[in-house]
Amino acid sequence: MKIRIAARGSKLSRIQVDMLGEKLKKIGIEYEIIDIKTKADLFSTDPLSKLGKGVFEKEVNEAVLEGKADIAVHSMKDILSEINPSLEIFAVLERDPPYDILIAEKNLDKLDSNITIGTSSIRRKNFLKYIKPEINTKDIRGNVDTRIRKYLSKEYQGLILAEASLKRLNMTMNYHRLNVYDFTPEANQGIIVALGRKKDEKIKEIFKEINHKDTLDEALAERAVISLVGGGCHSPIGVLFKKEGKEFYGIASYSDGKKKITVSISKPGDPYTIGSELGLLLKKEMKNEDIIP
């Protein structure tokens, strides 16, 4: 049997598909890649905030809905909190490091004033502004290779990226991992997800064999938070859960650049209930500060 996997045509997307594909091969399943151009690819120089929501996923998911592919593979942080009702999460791979990193000559504490850091994420911009208000940020688009090339050419004095991207691309840049209390990651950062058609029971059963349950539980808890308070690349909210045994450890943060709210939780339970509880804690603190999510 050969499974058709839809994904963006970028180098990173191809690597992510192959990571999932290797898991399939181990259980005797072949795969082929269906390259899809997304709005984010076609307008690669425009700010993400201008392109709207779902810019990395819409066309890829449509290929599955239209029967052109069996599975859509994404970085899970790029998919909306409300998945198309005809689609379902079939599997996630074991999570790569979820952290944000700083690529710069010095660590965050020692950065010079008035330098320019490249990031297109409002979350990263606001967290950085709260900690180091004297540092400038500037939008940067393009794949990871392009961003690093701009940094090396001195167009930027630093970059903030997801550590998982560098790991998957096998890049050996020196970097500084950012503390999760200062830079709480975007929900589902570091997770590769496979979406399929709900009605496709045969393929759903195949993907159960490669699903990493603890990672899925972390992902669902984080998605419960953002479904209450918002999240994603257009949001200044970060959330991260770590599951150890039956215990969930979670943190969620918001910043507008001038003030910052952080809440945490530690308890056993099911992902949705614990994630919702953390989301309500953050929502309550935001309301106390007259912030409307």
UniProtKB/Swiss-Prot annotation:
GO CC terms: cytoplasm
Cofactor(s) required, per the database record: dipyrromethane
CDD domains: PBP2_HemC_archaea (cd13644)
InterPro entries reported for this sequence: HemC, Porphobilin_deaminase_cofac_BS, Porphobilin_deaminase_N, Porphobilinogen_deaminase_C, Porphobilinogen_deaminase_C_sf
Cofactor comment: Binds 1 dipyrromethane group covalently.
Keywords: Porphyrin biosynthesis, Transferase
Domain of life where this protein originates: Archaea
Top EC group: transferase
Catalytic activities: 4 porphobilinogen + H2O = hydroxymethylbilane + 4 NH4(+)
GO biological process: protoporphyrinogen IX biosynthetic process
Residues with PTM S-(dipyrrolylmethanemethyl)cysteine: C233
Enzyme Commission number(s) from the entry: 2.5.1.61
Pfam families in alphabetical order: Porphobil_deam (PF01379), Porphobil_deamC (PF03900)
Signal peptide extent: none
Gene3D superfamilies according to UniProt: Periplasmic binding protein-like II, Porphobilinogen deaminase, C-terminal domain
Annotated metabolic or biological route of this protein: Porphyrin-containing compound metabolism; protoporphyrin-IX biosynthesis; coproporphyrinogen-III from 5-aminolevulinate: step 2/4
Function: Tetrapolymerization of the monopyrrole PBG into the hydroxymethylbilane pre-uroporphyrinogen in several discrete steps.
Similarity annotation: Belongs to the HMBS family.
PANTHER family, alphabetized: PORPHOBILINOGEN DEAMINASE (PTHR11557:SF0)
HAMAP family with a match to the protein in the record: Porphobil_deam
Protein name: Probable porphobilinogen deaminase
Lineage: Archaea, Thermoproteota, Thermoprotei, Sulfolobales, Sulfolobaceae
